[in-house]
C-alpha cells in the first residue's frame, strides 16, 4: 500500500492489519504517560486542507507528533490558493520543500487520486467531495470491533444523508469487506439512485431500521439540505429520522450509536442520546471513543505508509 485514497479495492487482510495496529496504538493512548517509539522522526507531513476540519486535522497532527514526525498545516484561505494557485502547483511546491507525505482534504471527488498521479510521496485522503473518507471509516470500524469483539455478521445501519456522504461510502466498502451486513436509512430524496446495487438493505422507516440493526452510524445532515428541496424542513426530518430516547425506548435493547461529527444536536441526534456514555437506557454513545480511535487509526496509517 503506497497511498490511502479510499477503502475501495483494499483486501480484508490490509484492513485487519491497519485495525490491529491501531488497536495497539489505542492502548498506548490510554496509558499514562503516553510513550511511543519515534518511528517517524525526521519525517515531515503536509496537512493540506481545502475544507474546514477539527477532529480530522487535529488527530492527524497528534498522530504525527506521537510518532515523532513534524507537520506543516495548510489552509486554503491563508495560502496562495486564495491568489489562484492550482492544486497541482500547491502539491509540487510542497514536494519541492521535501515533505514526506500529504494528508489531503478537498471539496472535489477524486482529488486525492489525482494527487497520487503528480507525486511519488504517500497521499492520505482526509475526505474528498462525496467520494471517500477512509480514515473515518477505519475509526468507525475499530470502534465497532472494540465494542462487539468482531465485525463479521454484524448488522450496521447508516442513517441520514447517504446521497452526499463520503463517510457512508467508505463505511459501506470497509464493513462489507469485513463481512458485516449493511442497511441505509433515509428519506428517499437523500438516497443515491441504485443504492441497492452496493449490496445494502434500504429502509425509509427508522423504527424498522433500528429493529433490524445491531448498531447505528448517524451522519451529519448538511443544514442547507432543508432549503435545497431534499427535506421538507429540519423539524420534519428530526421527527422522522432523528435518534431520540423515545425511539430507543420502543426498541428496548442496547445499541451503540456512532457519529462522525460535528453533530447537529436535536436534529439528527438528541442531546440525551449523544451524551449518554453508559446505560441506564437503551442507547450507548460511542462518540468520544471514536475521537480517541481516530488518533490511533491515523497513527496506524502513517506508520504503515512511512515507517521503514
From Swiss-Prot:
<comment type="subunit">
    <text>Heterododecamer (2C3:3R2) of six catalytic PyrB chains organized as two trimers (C3), and six regulatory PyrI chains organized as three dimers (R2).</text>
</comment>
<feature type="binding site">
    <location>
        <position position="261"/>
    </location>
    <ligand>
        <name>carbamoyl phosphate</name>
    </ligand>
</feature>
<dbReference type="InterPro" id="IPR006131">
    <property type="entry name" value="Asp_carbamoyltransf_Asp/Orn-bd"/>
</dbReference>
<feature type="binding site">
    <location>
        <position position="220"/>
    </location>
    <ligand>
        <name>L-aspartate</name>
    </ligand>
</feature>
<feature type="binding site">
    <location>
        <position position="136"/>
    </location>
    <ligand>
        <name>carbamoyl phosphate</name>
    </ligand>
</feature>
<dbReference type="GO" id="GO:0006207">
    <property type="term" value="P:'de novo' pyrimidine nucleobase biosynthetic process"/>
</dbReference>
<dbReference type="GO" id="GO:0006520">
    <property type="term" value="P:amino acid metabolic process"/>
</dbReference>
<protein>
    <recommendedName>
        <fullName>Aspartate carbamoyltransferase catalytic subunit</fullName>
        <ecNumber>2.1.3.2</ecNumber>
    </recommendedName>
</protein>
<comment type="similarity">
    <text>Belongs to the aspartate/ornithine carbamoyltransferase superfamily. ATCase family.</text>
</comment>
<dbReference type="GO" id="GO:0044205">
    <property type="term" value="P:'de novo' UMP biosynthetic process"/>
</dbReference>
<feature type="binding site">
    <location>
        <position position="56"/>
    </location>
    <ligand>
        <name>carbamoyl phosphate</name>
    </ligand>
</feature>
<keyword id="KW-0808">Transferase</keyword>
<feature type="binding site">
    <location>
        <position position="105"/>
    </location>
    <ligand>
        <name>carbamoyl phosphate</name>
    </ligand>
</feature>
<dbReference type="InterPro" id="IPR036901">
    <property type="entry name" value="Asp/Orn_carbamoylTrfase_sf"/>
</dbReference>
<comment type="function">
    <text>Catalyzes the condensation of carbamoyl phosphate and aspartate to form carbamoyl aspartate and inorganic phosphate, the committed step in the de novo pyrimidine nucleotide biosynthesis pathway.</text>
</comment>
<dbReference type="GO" id="GO:0005829">
    <property type="term" value="C:cytosol"/>
</dbReference>
<comment type="pathway">
    <text>Pyrimidine metabolism; UMP biosynthesis via de novo pathway; (S)-dihydroorotate from bicarbonate: step 2/3.</text>
</comment>
<feature type="binding site">
    <location>
        <position position="262"/>
    </location>
    <ligand>
        <name>carbamoyl phosphate</name>
    </ligand>
</feature>
<feature type="binding site">
    <location>
        <position position="83"/>
    </location>
    <ligand>
        <name>L-aspartate</name>
    </ligand>
</feature>
<dbReference type="Pfam" id="PF02729">
    <property type="entry name" value="OTCace_N"/>
</dbReference>
<dbReference type="InterPro" id="IPR006132">
    <property type="entry name" value="Asp/Orn_carbamoyltranf_P-bd"/>
</dbReference>
<dbReference type="InterPro" id="IPR006130">
    <property type="entry name" value="Asp/Orn_carbamoylTrfase"/>
</dbReference>
<keyword id="KW-0665">Pyrimidine biosynthesis</keyword>
<dbReference type="GO" id="GO:0016597">
    <property type="term" value="F:amino acid binding"/>
</dbReference>
<feature type="binding site">
    <location>
        <position position="166"/>
    </location>
    <ligand>
        <name>L-aspartate</name>
    </ligand>
</feature>
<feature type="binding site">
    <location>
        <position position="55"/>
    </location>
    <ligand>
        <name>carbamoyl phosphate</name>
    </ligand>
</feature>
<dbReference type="InterPro" id="IPR002082">
    <property type="entry name" value="Asp_carbamoyltransf"/>
</dbReference>
<dbReference type="Pfam" id="PF00185">
    <property type="entry name" value="OTCace"/>
</dbReference>
<dbReference type="GO" id="GO:0004070">
    <property type="term" value="F:aspartate carbamoyltransferase activity"/>
</dbReference>
<feature type="binding site">
    <location>
        <position position="133"/>
    </location>
    <ligand>
        <name>carbamoyl phosphate</name>
    </ligand>
</feature>
Amino acid at each position: 500500500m503506497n497511498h490511502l485514497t479510499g477503502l475501495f479495492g483494499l483486501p480484508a487482510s490490509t484492513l485487519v492489519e491497519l485495525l490491529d495496529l491501531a488497536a495497539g496504538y489505542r492502548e498506548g493512548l490510554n496509558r499514562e504517560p503516553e510513550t511511543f517509539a519515534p518511528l517517524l522522526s525526521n519525517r515531515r507531513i503536509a496537512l493540506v486542507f481545502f475544507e474546514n476540519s477539527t477532529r480530522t486535522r487535529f488527530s492527524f497532527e497528534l498522530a504525527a507528533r506521537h510518532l515523532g514526525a513534524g507537520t506543516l498545516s495548510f489552509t486554503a484561505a491563508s495560502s496562495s490558493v486564495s491568489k489562484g494557485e492550482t492544486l497541482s502547483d500547491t502539491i509540487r511546491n510542497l514536494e519541492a520543500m521535501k515533505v514526506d507525505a500529504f494528508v489531503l482534504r478537498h471539496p472535489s471527488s477524486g482529488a486525492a487520486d489525482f494527487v497520487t498521479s503528480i507525486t511519488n510521496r504517500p497521499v492520505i485522503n482526509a475526505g474528498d467531495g462525496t467520494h471517500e473518507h477512509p480514515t473515518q471509516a477505519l475509526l468507525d470500524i475499530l470502534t465497532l470491533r472494540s465494542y462487539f469483539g468482531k465485525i463479521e455478521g454484524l448488522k450496521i445501519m447508516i442513517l441520514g444523508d447517504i446521497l452526499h456522504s463520503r463517510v457512508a461510502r467508505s463505511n459501506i466498502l470497509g464493513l462489507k469487506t469485513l463481512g458485516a451486513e449493511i442497511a441505509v436509512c433515509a428519506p428517499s430524496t437523500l438516497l443515491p439512485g441504485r443504492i441497492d446495487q452496493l449490496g445494502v438493505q434500504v429502509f425509509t422507516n427508522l423504527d424498522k431500521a433500528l429493529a433490524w440493526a445491531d448498531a447505528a452510524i448517524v451522519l451529519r445532515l448538511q443544514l442547507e439540505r432543508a432549503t435545497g428541496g431534499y427535506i421538507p424542513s429540519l423539524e420534519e426530518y428530526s421527527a422522522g429520522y432523528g435518534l431520540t430516547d423515545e425511539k430507543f425506548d420502543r426498541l428496548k435493547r442496547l445499541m451503540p450509536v456512532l457519529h462522525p461529527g460535528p453533530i447537529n444536536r436535536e436534529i439528527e441526534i438528541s442531546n440525551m442520546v449523544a451524551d449518554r456514555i453508559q446505560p441506564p437506557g437503551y442507547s450507548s454513545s460511542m462518540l468520544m471513543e471514536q475521537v480517541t480511535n481516530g488518533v490511533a487509526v491515523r497513527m496506524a496509517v502513517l506508520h504503515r505508509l512511512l515507517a521503514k
